[in-house]
Amino acid sequence: MQIILLEKIGGLGNLGDIVTVKNGYARNFLIPAGKAKRATEANMKEFEARRAELEAKQAEILADARVRQEKLDGQTVTVAQKAGVDGRLFGSVTNADIAAAIVAAGIEAVKANVRLPNGPLKAVGEYEVEVALHTDAVAKITVAVVAATE
């Protein structure tokens, strides 16, 4: 299915690009989320009429993400979790735990933005984690996992 992208989508294209995607991806995700429209003549004309408005909106979203990225870059977030004497955790630290710690530090974050390339953290220590605030604004933070004291 041919669609017009209404915002930049990683791995797919930029605002205004006409791309071909699978029907299910377009119908079930991109179009309902407001990220794309079908590439019909009427929609193309409507998009061209609203292009400046959409570009300004995307620039504002990116600027907000860059401000949050500057606040987050290089920060250390501490997460306390029960651990054994050998340093292994009872359970694990997930992206939801890290997002909650970032929010507790006063910066807006969602668990879907936290990237853990090797899966959940399962041992005490310090880990480098990426927080994708936007496709063009990715902050690198240090997560210090410590043993919880009771």
Swiss-Prot record:
Swiss-Prot/TrEMBL keywords: Ribonucleoprotein, Ribosomal protein, RNA-binding, rRNA-binding
Q: Does the keyword RNA-binding apply?
A: yes
- Enumerate the Pfam families for this protein: Ribosomal_L9_C (PF03948), Ribosomal_L9_N (PF01281)
InterPro entries found in the cross-reference section: Ribosomal_bL9, Ribosomal_bL9/RNase_H1_N, Ribosomal_bL9_bac/chp, Ribosomal_bL9_C, Ribosomal_bL9_C_sf, Ribosomal_bL9_N, Ribosomal_bL9_N_sf
Q: Which GO terms describe its biological process?
A: translation
Entry-linked Gene3D superfamilies: Ribosomal protein L9, C-terminal domain, Ribosomal protein L9, N-terminal domain
Q: Name one GO cellular component term.
A: cytosolic large ribosomal subunit
**Which GO molecular function annotation, any one, does this entry have?**
structural constituent of ribosome
Q: What does the UniProt record say this protein does? A: Binds to the 23S rRNA.
Q: Which family does it belong to?
A: Belongs to the bacterial ribosomal protein bL9 family.
Q: This protein is called what?
A: Large ribosomal subunit protein bL9
